[in-house]
UniProtKB/Swiss-Prot annotation:
Lineage: Eukaryota, Fungi, Dikarya, Ascomycota, Saccharomycotina
Keyword Metal-binding attached: no
Gene Ontology BP annotations: mRNA splicing, via spliceosome
Protein name (database record): CWF19-like protein DRN1
Recorded family membership: Belongs to the CWF19 family.
Annotated organism of origin: Saccharomyces cerevisiae (strain ATCC 204508 / S288c) (Baker's yeast)
Pfam families, per the entry: CwfJ_C_1, CwfJ_C_2
Keywords assigned by UniProt, alphabetized: Cytoplasm, mRNA processing, Nucleus, Phosphoprotein
GO molecular function: enzyme activator activity; RNA lariat debranching enzyme activator activity
Length: 507
C-alpha cells in the first residue's frame, strides 16, 4: 500500500517564523512529510518564509482582490487563493474555498459553478468555515449550507476547516454511499494552546478503498441523518462551556417541520451546574432560581467610568429551553429582578442605558437573557439600528424567517402578556431601558419553529448601534479573552455589582 504522509497546520503571519521552526522540528522527528498544508487568514506573497529543508508546502489565503487560483512562490511553496482545485504530482487532489462566513452566501453561485463542472475525485477538501450539518451535530451555531453542498458533492476523504481559531475538533469517521470514508477536522491557530498541527497518513492510488479498513468508531453520515443525540467527540478546550448566549440556541435550518429537536442533557449543557466543565470563574452572582455570569467574547467594551465590558447573561439554574411566564411566575419575577438590578447599576454607577436581548424558542437548549450597557446618546438610535438589520434579514438573507417587530410600552401591556403567555409562540425580543424608573420599550418579533432564524441577529443589531462591527462574532480573535482576562472581568463586575446584587437580600 502506498501512503502519503501529510501535515496540516494553522498559523498567522505574526507567528510564522516561530511556527515554521516548530514545523521543521516535527518534520525531522515524525517525517519526512510528503506535503505540508498551511492555513492562514491572510498571507502576503511578498512575506518571506524560511522553508529550507521542508517538503512541498501549500499555503492557503483568502484575497478577493487576487483572481489567480494558484501561484508558485518558490520551488517548493505554492500559494492557493480563494477557491479552486489543485492536483499534486503524486495524484492527490485538493479542493479549496476559503471565503469567510459573511461572504460565502454571496459567492455561492461562483462556488457552485467552479466545482459543479468538476469530475475529479477529491482527496482533501479545505475550507475556512464548517458545514452546517456538522456544526449542528456539535451544538455550534456557525455553519454554512454552501459548505454542506460542496462537501456532499465532492465527498472528500479529509475535510479540514479553520474558522474556530481556539479549538481542535475531530469528528469520528463516516462513510459515503460509495463506501468512501471521510473525516472532518478543525485546526486551531498556533498559539491557541491546542493541537494546531495535525499529521496523518493517507493511502493514495487506485486501491484506497481496499487498503483502508473500516474503523471501529464509524458513525452515521452527518450529511444524511438528523441528529437527535450528542454522539460526538467534545471540543478539546476549557472554553467549550461558553457563556455566550448565541452558542446555546439551535435553530431548525431545515424546512422539514417534523425534524426532531436535538436533546441536550443538563450534564452536557453549557449553562447547567451539573456540567463538570462549567466555567464558574465567570459567574458574578447566584440567586435561588437564577444566576448571573459575564459573557464569553463580550460585545460591549469598557467605556468612560465603566472598566468592564458590562455584557452579561441572566440564566435560570433549572435546565429549561423555553420560559413559560404563566407557569413559572416565581422564576420570571426573579429574572426580571436581576434585570432591573443591572439596569439600575448601569444607570447610576456608569451613566448608561441598558438593552436586553433574548430568544424564546422551543428549539433552544437553555433559556437565558443577554444584558448589554448602551450609552445614553446611542439608545435613541436603537430603532434605526433594528430597522436596518431587519431589512438585511428580510431582503438579503431570503432563507431566514421574515421578521416584523411589534413595540409594546411595558411588561404589563395586555397585548404583550398575551403573546408571551402563548406557548405556541416563538420570538426574538429586545427590551430597551432608558432609565430604571421609566417603563421599558419592548420590541418583539414572532417566528415559526420550523423557520431558520439568524441566531446572531441581536448581536448584529447592537454591534451596529455601538459602532463595533468587528465584535459581531463572540469567538473572533477581537472578542475572545484569556481565562485570566475573564477572571479579572468577573471580579471587577462582582465588585461593581455588589451594591445591587439581589442574591444578597433573597430569602
Amino acid at each position: 500500500m502506498t501512503n502519503a504522509k501529510i501535515l496540516v497546520a494553522h498559523i498567522s503571519e505574526s507567528d510564522a517564523d516561530e511556527a515554521i521552526r516548530k514545523i521543521k522540528k516535527v518534520n525531522e522527528k515524525s517525517g519526512p512529510f510528503d506535503l505540508i498544508i498551511i492555513f492562514s487568514n491572510s498571507y502576503d506573497e511578498n512575506f518571506e518564509l524560511n522553508t529550507d529543508g521542508l517538503p512541498q508546502l501549500i499555503l492557503l489565503s483568502c484575497d478577493k482582490a487576487n483572481n489567480s487560483k494558484s501561484k508558485k512562490i518558490n520551488e517548493n511553496v505554492t500559494l492557493l487563493h480563494n477557491m479552486g482545485t489543485y492536483k499534486l504530482a503524486n495524484g492527490i487532489t485538493l479542493s479549496y474555498f476559503i471565503y469567510p462566513d459573511d461572504t460565502l452566501q454571496g459567492e455561492k453561485k461562483s462556488i457552485l459553478d467552479e466545482f459543479g463542472k468538476s469530475e475529479d475525485q477529491v482527496d482533501i477538501l479545505l475550507t475556512k468555515e464548517w458545514g452546517l450539518s456538522i456544526s449542528e451535530r456539535c451544538g455550534r451555531l456557525s455553519g454554512s449550507e454552501v459548505v454542506d453542498e460542496l462537501a456532499k458533492k465532492l465527498q472528500a476523504r479529509y475535510h479540514f476547516a479553520f474558522s474556530d481559531e481556539i479549538n481542535f475538533y475531530e469528528l469520528e469517521p463516516f462513510q459515503w454511499e460509495r463506501e468512501r470514508l471521510s473525516r472532518f477536522l478543525n485546526i486551531p491557530k498556533y498559539g491557541s494552546g491546542k493541537k494546531w498541527a495535525y499529521a496523518f497518513n493517507m493511502p493514495i492510488g487506485d486501491n484506497e478503498l481496499k487498503d483502508e479498513p473500516e474503523p471501529p468508531n464509524l458513525i452515521a453520515n452527518p450529511y444524511n441523518s438528523v441528529v437527535t443525540n450528542s454522539n460526538k467527540r467534545p471540543l478539546e478546550t476549557e472554553t467549550e462551556n461558553s457563556f455566550d448566549g448565541d452558542k446555546q440556541v439551535l435553530a431548525n435550518r431545515e424546512k422539514n417541520e417534523n425534524k426532531k429537536i436535538r436533546t441536550i442533557l443538563p450534564s452536557s449543557c453549557h449553562f447547567c451546574f451539573s456540567n463538570p466543565n462549567l466555567e464558574d470563574h465567570m459567574i458574578i452572582s447566584i440567586g435561588k432560581l437564577v444566576y448571573l455570569t459575564t459573557a464569553k467574547g463580550p460585545l460591549s467594551v469598557p467605556k468612560g467610568d465603566m472598566d468592564i465590558s458590562g455584557h452579561c447573561l441572566i440564566i435560570p439554574i433549572e435546565h429549561i429551553p423555553k420560559l413559560d411566564p404563566s407557569k413559572n411566575a416565581e422564576l420570571t419575577q426573579s429574572i426580571l429582578a436581576y434585570e432591573a438590578s443591572l439596569v439600575k447599576m448601569n444607570y447610576i454607577k456608569f451613566d448608561m442605558c441598558t438593552i436586553v436581548f433574548e430568544i424564546q424558542s422551543e428549539r433552544s437548549i437553555h433559556f437565558h437573557k443577554q444584558v448589554i450597557p448602551v450609552p445614553k446618546y446611542l439608545v435613541l438610535k436603537f430603532c434605526s439600528a433594528l430597522d436596518r438589520q431587519v431589512h438585511f434579514n428580510n431582503e438579503k438573507f431570503t432563507r431566514n424567517a421574515k421578521l416584523e417587530f411589534q413595540c409594546y410600552d411595558s411588561h404589563s401591556s395586555k397585548q404583550y402578556v398575551d403573546v408571551i403567555n402563548n406557548q405556541s409562540n416563538n420570538y426574538l425580543q429586545f427590551t430597551v431601558y432608558e432609565t430604571p424608573e421609566a417603563d421599558p420599550k419592548i420590541y418583539l418579533a414572532t417566528f415559526n419553529a420550523s423557520e431558520t432564524i439568524d441566531l446572531q441577529f441581536g448581536r448584529r443589531v447592537l454591534a451596529f448601534l455601538l459602532n463595533l462591527p468587528r465584535r459581531v462574532k463572540w469567538n473572533s480573535s477581537t472578542c475572545l479573552q484569556t481565562k485570566q482576562q475573564e477572571t479579572i472581568e468577573a471580579e471587577k463586575f462582582q465588585k461593581a455589582y455588589r451594591t445591587y446584587d439581589i442574591s444578597l437580600t433573597e430569602n
